[in-house]
Amino acid sequence: MFEKLSQAACSEPFAFLGPFIDPTQGALRVWMPGATGVALVLEGQPRIALEREKESAFILKADLNLHLTHYQLAIDWNGIEQLVDDPYQYHGIYAEYDDLHTPKTMYQHMGSQFMTLERDGKSISGIRFLVYAPHATAVSLVGSFNDWDGRRHPMQRLDYGIWGLFIPGLTEGVSYKFEMKGPKGEGLPHKADPWGFYAEQYPSFASVTYDHARYQWQDAQWQTRPVTEKRKEALSFYELHAGSWKRNEQGEFLNYRELAAELVPYLVDMGYTHVELMPVSEHPFYGSWGYQPVGLFAPTSRYGSPDDFKFFVDACHQAGIGVVLDWVPAHFPSDDHGLANFDGTPLFHDPDPRRGWHQDWNSFIYDLGREQVRRFLVSNALYWFEQFHIDGIRVDAVASMLYLDYSRSHGQWIPNMDGGNENYDAIATLKWMNEEVYKYFPNAMTIAEESTAFPGVSAPTFMGGLGFGFKWNMGWMHDSLSYIKEEPVHRKYHHNTLTFPLVYAHSENYVLSLSHDEVVYGKGSIHNKMPGDEWQQTANLRAYFGYMYGQPGKKLNFMGAEIGQTAEWNHDDQLQWFLLDFPRHQGVQALTRDLNHLYRNEAALHDQDCIPAGFEWRLQDAAEQSIIAHERISEAGERILVVSNFTPVPRDEFRLGVPNKGRYQLLLNTDDSKYAGSGYEVVVDVKSEAVVSEDLAQSIVLRLPPLSTLFYKLA
């Protein structure tokens, strides 16, 4: 046993260290590498020196029964004394089976947890560490409290593949990792805590102890608001990368609190309902934008502490802004300190690269056929809702999870048990995650980034769906951008590209997304996808945004689009805020603000987004003129007419059939001079006439500005 202890290879330290159960064998054994002496300290009694048994072992052979007695150790480090509680007197370090295997409670027990244990009538505070490493032959806790010496604190092998140890007296802010021996006794890289709540940056990547109970939330009014049906709400998401929205004068990141001070009033002014953060789970490589996470339970410390991130969410909620996080359960990177070969085996991924390795992203794929991996991920999703009060998660790369042959050629994948390409384990996991989230957090929302036609992504699980609340409409994004990139003179040949998305617009609960994916890897900015000179580019962009807000579906824009950013997004720099010195870009920002407020204020533009009753075509086939028109209809029967002219040719007397007799009043014109438009005179109030047009008995005559979208409300 001494040899195992000296090699940090002991799996049952409680059988050898601490108080002896049989006092005839002695009273106490202590293993303290590097110490020159150890003494027993009992309250109100003289100290008793322990004898050196081996080089690092000390033993007390007195006839004392310390099995139920609280004691301390006075350790002599070459003349410097340290008084500590002996961790190996605390046997009550475990938790109930259900607590360790139920997603809702796992994060309250695994990893590092502050707790108080009773011993000999005393309340002893400290931190209990639990880690799942079933194939390890030994696990030690190493950290700043023991000079990263794996011999000092061997952990006890418990049941169900879990190792544990309670360290009395530890406080917040202590760095730690796990030192393990693999199945054959081989040494492994030090591992960060998979359940760690806080982490350091390069070079240590160590986990850090953190107490969730300390932060005092101020968002009770938000948290207790009535449960609503999100499909009927106006949802406008501002997708944001925390490191590159704004920088300080030195070009450094804003921390979470500084970001809150700048961002929250901006979101309120601009009319957004939610901020959607690109992944904040700890990730070692900044250039991954968070999509290669290692610490799933830790908000990245690049921008501050977990308390600082809570402050950010708190500030958003107090201002009426919801917070959605990007969540990455599809894959994880191969960094040595992370989940890869965690206990010397492919614990979190399939050993067969045809199922366990993502060749596009050079990352491991979670093995969702393993119950403990599924629980780990579902627990992580619930954790962010409970501990950080988030309002939703946007699940990244769902298609890569659903299909075993995703981005793979013949021979590079393994079929399921029925010979197909569906990943049954991933499907079951996503369903379970959604059920758990909505069960415990009924006001939450889950959103899928799913790029295929997999059926029922946003259908309830009891109807055979995956159970997401919403799905990004990747088809709309692709088709609409493909259309708007065409020169106006050519758009008539691509008219069907613009109208086709309405064929399936209500097959899912859709979010119309113009995400970060569209402004990277040489794709350019949304602004620069527009054809023509500078004025036409901006006019096209305004018309396109108007068209987007008039279409059925919730809205998402990546940061920078709202100011007409001209450069492709660069995560190493802030947005081009200087563009707001120019009227054209001021106009795009002002339009985005007005579109958000219009969308939120007019029920017809949002409360039937997800059902066919909320949309009617008024003009679908005017390809030669590149004009479309439709009406949006609220549950209460309110109607808003949306007309888009995608050519630079103004239409002086454009007759359009309408189904209802009445007056149509202008709500918004994307070509208005206040948006730096042409200022072409439009009709602000028009009464329908009994003139047949488009097979409708009533019609109105409008003036359509060049490259514009108009909104009229039926009075």
Curated annotation (Swiss-Prot):
First and last residue of the signal peptide: none
Cross-referenced Pfam families: Alpha-amylase (PF00128), Alpha-amylase_C (PF02806), CBM_48 (PF02922), GlgB_N (PF22019)
GO CC annotations on file: cytosol
Keywords in alphabetical order: Carbohydrate metabolism, Glycogen biosynthesis, Glycogen metabolism, Glycosyltransferase, Transferase
Matching InterPro entries: A-amylase/branching_C (IPR006048), Branching_enzy (IPR037439), GlgB (IPR006407), GlgB_N (IPR054169), GlgB_N_E_set_prok (IPR044143), Glyco_hydro_13_cat_dom (IPR006047), Glyco_hydro_13_N (IPR004193), Glyco_hydro_b (IPR013780)
Enzyme class label: transferase
Gene3D superfamilies: Glycosidases, Golgi alpha-mannosidase II, Immunoglobulins
Superkingdom of source: Bacteria
GO biological process terms on file: glycogen biosynthetic process
Disulfide bonds: none
EC number(s) given by UniProt: 2.4.1.18
Listed pathway(s): Glycan biosynthesis; glycogen biosynthesis
Catalysed transformations (reactions): Transfers a segment of a (1->4)-alpha-D-glucan chain to a primary hydroxy group in a similar glucan chain
Active site: D396, E449
GO molecular function, one term: cation binding
Alphabetized HAMAP family for the sequence: GlgB
Assembly and binders: Monomer.
Family per similarity comment: Belongs to the glycosyl hydrolase 13 family. GlgB subfamily.
Protein function: Catalyzes the formation of the alpha-1,6-glucosidic linkages in glycogen by scission of a 1,4-alpha-linked oligosaccharide from growing alpha-1,4-glucan chains and the subsequent attachment of the oligosaccharide to the alpha-1,6 position.
Name used for this protein in its record: 1,4-alpha-glucan branching enzyme GlgB
